[in-house]
Amino acid sequence: MKYKCLVLDHDDTVVDSTASIHYPSLVEFCKIYRPDYHVTLEEYMVLNFEPGIYEYLKDILQLSDEEFDLENEFWNDYVLKHIPHAFKGIKEILEEFKARGGYICVSSHSYKENILRDYKANDLPIPDLIYGWELPQEKRKPATYTLEAIMKELNLKPDELVMVDDLKPGKVMADNAGVDFIGAGWAYDVKAITDYMSKECKLYCKTVEEFKKLILD
């Protein structure tokens, strides 16, 4: 295999979750705390892409620190009650990658405990390392901290890893860490996102099958 370690984003890369969980959670939160604010699913996805979820909540929704904490609790409670499905074919890819001796790690904006729950619920190979939203804000994507921590923990060089993500923060992190990046384009078809990712990503997969061939062939 070309890579010894897959570093996977979680939402809309491994599991189909933004449309079914994260967006509905925000809609319900806004009904209470921002009743005059309305956002479509596509608009929400674009805002997650640029400027990113933290900046979206703080700068666009202008949540106070107290409201930000409330939204975080509201979102996590919603996530705990809803388990997303893994994309068809992902399980087989991860199983084969592990069987060949590869490492599987996660760098995500979801909580570690919820990521682990989703992997278990979908009968996926348990990741070797998981870095999630529990990290301080300055260490989350697009900061390079998680990739650097993975390389240190597993004694790997930058060219032995590949980051797989559907959004820009993962690409920025990988580029800044000198790690290869694969754009995951199989979750949705939002023009603003797919246009950027297909243009800017040297490696971009529209389907899970394309990803399988790239990683395992």
Please name every model-derived segment:
Residues M1-K4, K112, L116-D217:
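Asp-based, Mg2+/Mn2+-dependent phosphohydrolase catalytic module
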Residues K2-E92, E96:
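N-terminal helical cap/lid subdomain that shapes the substrate entry/recognition surface
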Residues V14, I104, M163-V164:
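Conserved SAM-binding loop
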Residues K31-Y37, R100, N122-I126, N155-L156:
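Short helix-capping segments at alpha-helix termini
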Residues Y78-V106, K112-L116, T144:
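Short, acidic loop-to-helix structural element flanking the phosphoryl-transfer center
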